[in-house]
């Protein structure tokens, strides 16, 4: 005998609006395109683009940066923070 039908949790989840699914920009690694071999901690303008408003480093899944450059980027940002070129938090202006 067959038991009662069971539903997956997928069926009970609310549906996402179609608007979010329509516009997806293809992410690309900025450093690969420009041919950068190594990220320098003294290039503050580039590093600022990868820091969120609250002071956190933006993850690679959002920026599209390749893993090798994301590691270099993290190291460069941390060095620039240590040398007071970049702020640690959002309490200070960049």
UniProtKB/Swiss-Prot annotation:
One of its GO terms (biological process) is translation. It comes from the Bacteria. Keywords: Ribonucleoprotein, Ribosomal protein, RNA-binding, rRNA-binding. GO terms for cellular component: cytosolic small ribosomal subunit. GO terms for molecular function: small ribosomal subunit rRNA binding; structural constituent of ribosome. Disulfide bonds: none annotated. Belongs to the bacterial ribosomal protein bS18 family. Part of the 30S ribosomal subunit. Forms a tight heterodimer with protein bS6. PANTHER family: 30S RIBOSOMAL PROTEIN S18, SMALL RIBOSOMAL SUBUNIT PROTEIN BS18M. Binds as a heterodimer with protein bS6 to the central domain of the 16S rRNA, where it helps stabilize the platform of the 30S subunit. This is Small ribosomal subunit protein bS18.
């Amino acid at each position: 005998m067959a038991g009662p039908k069971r539903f997956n949790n997928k069926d009970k989840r609310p549906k996402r609006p179609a608007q979010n699914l329509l516009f997806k920009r293809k992410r690309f690694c900025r450093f690969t395109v420009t041919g950068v071999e190594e990220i320098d901690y003294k290039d503050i303008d580039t590093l600022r683009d990868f820091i969120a408003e609250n002071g956190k480093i933006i993850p690679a899944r959002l920026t599209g940066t390749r893993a090798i450059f994301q590691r270099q980027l993290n190291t460069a940002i941390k060095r620039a923070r240590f040398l007071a070129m970049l702020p640690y938090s959002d309490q200070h202006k960049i």
